[in-house]
């Protein structure tokens, strides 16, 4: 027996079907690789792709649209790109590059893309940020006024660094640039400062050594390492500092403090030059492209001290530049010197003569850090730069003149002891209270009778003596941030007592 379907039922079924009709069409704009070499693909067919947009190859590799030409697009490949060849399909992702940020990545070693490379499992990040962001404007900033202590006497006394400052570390290879940066990270322990170390174009073994050193001193607990070694493509090396600064900005914008080290921007500029030349952009001075200044200025301008309305967070940058035979007048060094708020100049001759950290006090400056220096340091190190300059002058003169008058001889001897005081072994940063005490002792003649070669021994024995018998001195300097008459009297008494007992 056949059942008849009423016409109303048919129409209601058709209506229902039409209402629930859903078709999933995935529209993606694709193109084809027409040429590929040295980590750069020339792609045809991505007519609507935007500058800096992410694209995906059907091999699984990702890239960034870097050159937008009339008939093709120049794409820099992130990753090895070994399987990309002519004819490989490429599709637009319609998004810009983002990296994970937040506390989840603190203590980790990551690559340029924010992927973990330390074998400690996946990163569970709650927030992702664009790697290219605008730097804070003038009104969003506040002048630098809080100190960021490095733990190095020569820097904290003579070229002080403030939170939110950009201070360049510049010098030839093997002069201790990375050591200064690592010391600064170690000294941030307990200071509530998150540190980011960006390694660009370094050897994997060198970065592993840095990570091991940070772990030894318990500094990895508040540090992120972004690694783009020499084996990575030029694009990965070029983007690494931007990944690092994006991570730092998260803390800066959340009313916290961060420190970022770029090791080093010379290799960063070389990676950018390599990329630009492969993309056939016109070369300029030293074959660098015309926008190499903008490359570094937009990166370093993102370090800032924010105003109180925005939370008063800060991001301090310590870029490193490697010079060739002390040539600070080369293209990249002069560019970065003009962008930063001062520079710490390390010299090969000083390093080889045993003065370490090998800081050339005459050429090193801090343009804004003076406002951040605590009063106690200002009191003891006020004339130190001038005294050292006069000592260097006298030293040069005394090589030719044998008969020096009494005051010149005393000045020469005092200078020798001050140079000894500023020496410091690597990876042993000092608290600001200890720095103030030893510089006070040197500047006020307490070391004049101590042989120059015994100054380091004097210093190493002085701190335990004061901690045991005069702990209040450390406390007073720490709390008051200055040396008042009472503290000075106590310190003088302690130094006199120690000198009598010191077995030189």
UniProtKB/Swiss-Prot annotation:
The record marks 364 as: Required for activity. InterPro entries: ATP_synth_asu-like_sf, ATP_synth_asu_C, ATP_synth_asu_C_sf, ATP_synth_F1_a_nt-bd_dom, ATP_synth_F1_asu, ATPase_a/bsu_AS, ATPase_F1/V1/A1_a/bsu_N, ATPase_F1/V1/A1_a/bsu_N_sf. It catalyses: ATP + H2O + 4 H(+)(in) = ADP + phosphate + 5 H(+)(out). ATP binds at residues 171-178. One of its GO terms (cellular component) is proton-transporting ATP synthase complex. It is a peripheral membrane protein. Its EC number is 7.1.2.2. CDD domains: ATP-synt_F1_alpha_C (cd18113), ATP-synt_F1_alpha_N (cd18116), F1-ATPase_alpha_CD (cd01132). It is found in: Cell inner membrane. It comes from the Bacteria. Belongs to the ATPase alpha/beta chains family. Produces ATP from ADP in the presence of a proton gradient across the membrane. The alpha chain is a regulatory subunit. This is ATP synthase subunit alpha. It comes from Helicobacter hepaticus (strain ATCC 51449 / 3B1). The gene is atpA.
């Amino acid at each position: 027996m056949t059942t008849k379907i009423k016409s109303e039922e048919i129409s209601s079924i058709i209506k229902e079907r039409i209402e629930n009709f859903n078709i999933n069409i995935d529209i993606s704009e694709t193109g084809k690789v027409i040429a590929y070499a040295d980590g750069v693909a020339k792609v045809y067919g991505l007519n609507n792709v935007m500058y800096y947009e992410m694209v995906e190859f059907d091999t699984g590799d990702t890239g960034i649209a870097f050159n937008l030409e009339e008939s093709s697009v120049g794409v820099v490949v992130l990753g090895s790109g070994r399987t990309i060849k002519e004819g490989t399909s490429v599709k637009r992702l319609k998004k810009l590059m983002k990296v994970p940020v937040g506390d989840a990545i603190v203590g980790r070693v990551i690559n340029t893309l924010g992927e973990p490379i330390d074998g400690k499992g996946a990163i569970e990040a709650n927030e992702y940020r664009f790697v290219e962001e605008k730097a804070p404007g003038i009104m969003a900033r506040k002048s630098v006024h809080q100190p960021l202590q490095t733990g190095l006497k020569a820097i904290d006394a003579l070229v002080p660094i403030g939170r939110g400052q950009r201070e360049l570390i510049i010098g030839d290879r093997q002069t201790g640039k990375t050591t200064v940066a690592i010391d600064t990270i170690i000294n941030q322990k307990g200071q509530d400062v998150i540190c980011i170390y960006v390694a660009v174009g370094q050897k994997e073994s060198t970065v592993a050594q840095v990570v091991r050193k940070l772990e030894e001193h318990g500094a990895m607990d508040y540090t992120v390492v972004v690694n783009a070694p020499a084996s990575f493509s030029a694009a990965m090396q070029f983007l690494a500092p931007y990944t690092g600064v994006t991570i730092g900005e998260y803390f800066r914008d959340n009313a916290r403090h961060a420190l970022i080290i770029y090791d080093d921007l010379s290799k960063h500029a070389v990676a950018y030059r390599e990329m630009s030349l492969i993309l056939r952009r016109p070369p300029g001075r030293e074959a660098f492209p015309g926008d190499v200044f903008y490359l570094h200025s937009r990166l370093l301008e993102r370090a800032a001290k924010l105003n109180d309305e925005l939370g008063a967070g800060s991001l301090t940058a310590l870029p490193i530049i490697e010079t060739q035979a002390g040539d600070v007048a080369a293209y990249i060094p002069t560019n970065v010197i003009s962008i930063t708020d001062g520079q710490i100049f390390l010299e090969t001759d000083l390093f080889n003569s045993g003065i370490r950290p090998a800081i050339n006090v005459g050429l090193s400056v801090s343009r804004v850090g003076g406002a951040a220096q605590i009063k106690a340091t200002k009191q003891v190190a006020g004339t130190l730069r001038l005294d050292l300059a006069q000592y260097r002058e006298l030293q040069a003169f005394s090589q030719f003149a044998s008969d020096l008058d009494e005051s010149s001889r005393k000045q020469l001897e005092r200078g020798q002891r001050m140079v000894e005081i500023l020496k410091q072994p690597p990876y042993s940063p000092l608290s600001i209270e200890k720095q103030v005490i030893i510089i006070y002792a040197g500047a006020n003649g307490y070391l004049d009778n101590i042989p120059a070669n015994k100054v380091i021994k004097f210093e190493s024995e002085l701190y335990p003596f004061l901690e045991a018998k005069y702990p209040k001195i450390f406390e007073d300097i720490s709390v008051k941030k200055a040396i008042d008459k009472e503290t000075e009297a106590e310190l003088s008494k302690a130094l006199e007592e120690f000198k009598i007992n010191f077995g030189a």
